[in-house]
Amino acid sequence: MPRRREVPKREILPDPKFGSVELAKFMNVVMLDGKKAVAERIIYGALEQVQVKTGKDAIEVFNLAINNIKPIVEVKSRRVGGANYQVPVEVRPVRRLALAMRWLREAAKKRGEKSMDLRLAGELIDASEGRGAAMKKREDTHKMAEANKAFSHFRW
């Protein structure tokens, strides 16, 4: 139990172009060394590419991709009597979004395209269609949870 009062969550302002809070949050995830303008350029460039390649609304593709990547369950280590068990636990909504964004960023970084905005655009399109490295990460997480279902009674 915390000894001090709970620190309030900071409100994130929606991004200027699309008015989306999720996109503004993703911008903060992509940002390195406080360079928000660079992150903004990468994301808006990626969304432009998505619009050109798919012909669909870029923000809809982004939201669909994020929703497809969000994990429902994950495993946490729990020590019981000298043995470590991987216990499946449900993921809280805030963490779901954070994990999805982090996985999307990491998957985009590992792609082969020339610039980050092209990589991100490719990963967004793949994730919105249910494939790609970020989706594989989600499936692997779910498989781990399914495989360790027997230890779910150790939940705390």
From Swiss-Prot:
One of the primary rRNA binding proteins, it binds directly to 16S rRNA where it nucleates assembly of the head domain of the 30S subunit. Is located at the subunit interface close to the decoding center, probably blocks exit of the E-site tRNA. Keywords: Ribonucleoprotein, Ribosomal protein, RNA-binding, rRNA-binding, tRNA-binding. This is Small ribosomal subunit protein uS7. Part of the 30S ribosomal subunit. Contacts proteins S9 and S11. GO terms for molecular function: rRNA binding; structural constituent of ribosome; tRNA binding. The keyword Transmembrane does not apply. Belongs to the universal ribosomal protein uS7 family. One of its GO terms (cellular component) is small ribosomal subunit. CDD domains: uS7_Bacteria. It comes from the Bacteria. GO terms for biological process: translation.
